[in-house]
């Protein structure tokens, strides 16, 4: 999860988030090289007193600065498209959970079970127990099995919301009248926090998301106790 004065991303908990971190590093390296080259050229032009006669009108230079950006864009686009397809629909999810955004809480329905659904509200600061996180704890956590592909169906009952869990690389808009889809798979157990990431009204900051990823046996025991 995030902490004070954090400069980087949260630790990756899913294969998709690991891919996104690698893509971020790849893109940042390209940006750094471009910036260094531009600064070098600017410095060179400002410090030299000589001017090459063909600098302002050279066919070779124009060819280079046309082809080079095209190559750079391809180097960025190819891994980006790969990740985009990896994030696309999975054919056989082990579990499907429907998420509905409300002003200002989330409701969840486990569609593979006959009657397993609940609302998830933020716990007020005055009711927090020692060690619990302010503005991030909820009364009902979303318990999910780890190391299994899970499909999230996301929509809204009222206004635009956005269901986001950074450590899993998830951010999907919740739009009234439209059902969006996201897939997740956690590589390790734990609690993973997120928040609504679309301004949705006065209490937008008070609708957190808490996922509890557990081994399959623990999930089966929990689901049995909830039905």
Curated annotation (Swiss-Prot):
Residues 1-14, 88-227 are mitochondrial intermembrane. The keyword Mitochondrion applies. It comes from Cephalopachus bancanus. Component of the cytochrome c oxidase, the last enzyme in the mitochondrial electron transport chain which drives oxidative phosphorylation. The respiratory chain contains 3 multisubunit complexes succinate dehydrogenase (complex II, CII), ubiquinol-cytochrome c oxidoreductase (cytochrome b-c1 complex, complex III, CIII) and cytochrome c oxidase (complex IV, CIV), that cooperate to transfer electrons derived from NADH and succinate to molecular oxygen, creating an electrochemical gradient over the inner membrane that drives transmembrane transport and the ATP synthase. Pfam families: COX2 (PF00116), COX2_TM (PF02790). This is Cytochrome c oxidase subunit 2. Cu cation A2 binds at residues 196, 198, 200, 204. Its main location: mitochondrion. GO terms for cellular component: mitochondrial inner membrane; respiratory chain complex IV. Cu cation A1 binds at residues 161, 196, 200, 207. One of its GO terms (molecular function) is cytochrome-c oxidase activity. InterPro entries: CcO_II, CcO_II-like_C, CcO_II_C, Copper_CuA, Cupredoxin, Cyt_c_oxidase_su2, Cyt_c_oxidase_su2_TM_dom, Cyt_c_oxidase_su2_TM_sf. Belongs to the cytochrome c oxidase subunit 2 family. It is an enzyme of class 7 (translocase). The chain crosses the membrane at residues 15-45, 60-87. Component of the cytochrome c oxidase (complex IV, CIV), a multisubunit enzyme composed of 14 subunits. The complex is composed of a catalytic core of 3 subunits MT-CO1, MT-CO2 and MT-CO3, encoded in the mitochondrial DNA, and 11 supernumerary subunits COX4I, COX5A, COX5B, COX6A, COX6B, COX6C, COX7A, COX7B, COX7C, COX8 and NDUFA4, which are encoded in the nuclear genome.
């Amino acid at each position: 999860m995030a902490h004070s004065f954090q400069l980087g991303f949260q630790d990756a908990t899913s294969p998709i988030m690991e891919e996104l971190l690698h893509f971020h590093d790849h893109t940042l390296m390209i940006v750094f090289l471009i910036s260094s080259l531009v600064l070098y050229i600017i410095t060179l032009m400002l410090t030299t007193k000589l001017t090459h006669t063909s600098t302002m009108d050279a066919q070779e230079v124009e060819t280079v600065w046309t082809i080079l950006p095209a190559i750079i864009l391809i180097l960025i686009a190819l891994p980006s498209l790969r990740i985009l397809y990896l994030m696309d629909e999975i054919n056989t999810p082990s579990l499907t959970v429907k998420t509905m955004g409300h002003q200002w809480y989330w409701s969840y329905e486990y569609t593979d079970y006959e009657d397993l659904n609940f609302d998830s509200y933020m716990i007020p600061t005055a009711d927090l127990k020692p060690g619990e996180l302010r503005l991030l704890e909820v009364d009902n956590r979303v318990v999910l099995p780890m190391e299994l592909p899970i499909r999230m169906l996301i929509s809204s009952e009222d206004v635009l919301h956005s269901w986001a869990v950074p450590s899993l690389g998830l951010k999907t808009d919740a739009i009234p009248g439209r059902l969006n889809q996201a897939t997740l798979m956690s590589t390790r157990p734990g609690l993973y926090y997120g928040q609504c990431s679309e301004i949705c009204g006065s209490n937008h900051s008070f609708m957190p998301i808490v996922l509890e990823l557990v081994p399959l046996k623990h999930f089966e025991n929990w689901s049995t106790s909830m039905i």
